């Protein structure tokens, strides 16, 4: 018998519908796909289609929207029938939410969640662990870092040049935190102009290198598409391996119109995508502003604090500014936070503090 091989969920809060695309290893016109939507144990919506046609589900009038403040998830039950015979059934989940941008009354383009302005604020999270490096010791450790991030008052995480295991994204969905997903950097560094729009010559990757980038970036988006927490795709960081920026930004937006595209965090800057992303250390500074896109501070901070027995290299402390006491570090953090607060009405729509773990 045939089976379900993949599902892809796309919410549309403006039309109050959920689209579920179901892939199977065969397709026959007599096959039927049925999707049931549950809120807890209660069946709240369902839809049916012929195998190969997306299932469009009208959601209830009192639909619950997903947000960091209220991360409402709906459970899904997806069934594949051959004629009237059930041949496969899988369970999943989805959320109703929308990421977009909109010009506010002062003419500044703002990030929006569910059609409401939202300042997105979170740490640069490179996903490092003291023992396993890129591998977390256990599932609880993944949860701990995300929960701590929320406890600190953040509503977003910039997942920096790393793709996490599926469990991590599920925890973000359940706990309620928005994710900016970076493409891991590759190839070489071209010229980097971070303080103005790029006027240099972009790097040309080899045919093989470009093909690898495009293949892997598509695979990342395919793999993570149905996680509601992901709000922004970030194809490049600080010019590393950056090439054909407007084309890559446009491809990303067309391939997944449900997310925002931050073309190049920290430059090189182009007038494409949904955001202009500045990096400035150590304190926040808005040295460039884009009237057509959301202007964001993609990295700042980097306050280092020496903690005995918490150092990877005991003789080398990390940080753009370094302190020896918790009070000094906290005071500096608050100083930067107050500077940032004053820059929000002037144009910043998001900020990323460096960083969750003290790595380079």
Identify the role of each PLM range.
Residues 1-171, 175-179, 214-216, 231-232, ...:
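Secreted/periplasmic carbohydrate-active enzymes, especially glycoside hydrolases
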